Structure formats: C-alpha cells, structure tokens
C-alpha cells in the first residue's frame, strides 16, 4: 500500500472493505488520481471490494491455486467473473483486459461482448480483425528480465520488463494494455 506520504506492507492481497475505503479516502486526500488494486477471488467472495466501482479490470488467469477456498474450478471462475460486471466494473465504459491464453477466457469474453481487449503471449500474429487484440513476438527471457515486441492495434513497441518469467510478462502487458486503453 503506497501513495504520496504513506507506505506500508499489506497484510492481505485486498484489504477488508472498511479498511480499504479508509485507505482509498486517504489516498484521495493525498491527491492521488488513480488506485491500482490486486483484487483476489477471496476478496470478491468476502465482499471486500464493496463500494468500489472500477474503471478497468484484468483477468490474469484461473489456476488450481485457490481450490482450498473455492469448492471447484467452476465456482472459482464464477467468483472471479463478478469483477467484470456491475456493481464492481462500470457498466457502459468499463475496460476489460483478458488473458487470451487462459482456457477459461472464452466463457467470460462472450459475456462481455465488445467491452473486452484480448492479450496473448503465445500467438505470434493477430488472428483477429478488431482493434482490441494485443500480442507479443520475439520474446526473450534472461536472468534480468524479459524483452519482446508488443503489438497494439496501432503500433509495435519494444519492451523490457525487469521481471523473470512468462507470467510476469503477461501481467506487464495486461497492465500496459489498460494504460493504452485509458490513453
């Protein structure tokens, strides 16, 4: 948790609603313009993001990591799915960035219609005829990070991500896609 004049180590991925709202208010009072939150499936299930309406949301992946909490993959997916619809995501102009490489994404992207952008680290050429597909080519992974060419609908960008691993590259390009969509 950080904003101008404040920094602390978080005790949870996403704070409980009352504490989260107090922190968001303090950040606004410190003249922060944006908040970037990691929203866990636990926090969605426990209503920790009550009172938050997001401009944008990212679907990173769905793995078996949290089956200790969720009874099965379908209920885990249904919990994560809630983030992409009201009351959490703005209904008309909320931005959705989805990991095209995740097998669960087809269940979500069809529900979102034209509100979503797809991102891939596995496809080497755009297979889509729309303005909402982002992908990478020329990936190289080293001990110091990852490099690639990031293809947007309008340009190609040489990227260096100072984090190791394909999942970190995917997380980075999804975050960059949000910034791109927000101009």
Write out the residue ranges for each language-model feature.
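Short hydrophobic/charged patches on amphipathic alpha-helices used for structural packing
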Residues: 24-25, 46, 81
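Acidic, Mg2+-coordinating active-site environments of NTP-dependent enzymes
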Residues: 30-32, 56-183
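Short beta->alpha connector loops
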Residues: 40-43, 101-103
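Conserved helix/coil segment N-terminal to the catalytic DExD/H
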Residues: 43-50
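Short, hinge-like loop/turn segments at secondary-structure boundaries
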Residues: 9-14, 53-55, 113-115
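Conserved nucleotide-sensing/catalytic segment adjacent to the nucleotide-binding pocket
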Residues: 8-40
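Walker A (P-loop) phosphate-binding motif
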Residues: 1-9
């Amino acid at each position: 948790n950080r904003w101008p004049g404040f920094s602390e180590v978080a005790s949870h991925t996403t704070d409980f609603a009352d504490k989260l709202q107090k922190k968001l208010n303090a950040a606004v009072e410190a003249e922060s313009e944006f908040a970037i939150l990691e929203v866990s499936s636990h926090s969605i299930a426990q209503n920790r993001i009550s009172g938050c309406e997001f401009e944008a949301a990212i679907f990173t992946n769905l793995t078996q990591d949290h089956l200790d909490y969720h009874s099965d993959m379908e209920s885990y997916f249904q919990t994560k799915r809630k983030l992409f619809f009201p009351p959490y995501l703005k209904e008309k102009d909320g931005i959705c960035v989805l990991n095209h490489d995740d097998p669960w994404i087809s269940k979500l992207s069809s529900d979102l219609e034209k509100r979503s952008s797809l991102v891939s680290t596995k496809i080497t050429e755009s297979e889509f005829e729309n303005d909402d597909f982002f992908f990478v080519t020329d990936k190289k992974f080293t001990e110091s990070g990852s490099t690639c060419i990031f293809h947007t609908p309008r340009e190609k960008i040489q990227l260096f991500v100072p984090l190791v691993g394909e999942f970190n590259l995917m997380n980075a390009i999804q975050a960059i896609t949000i910034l791109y969509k927000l101009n």
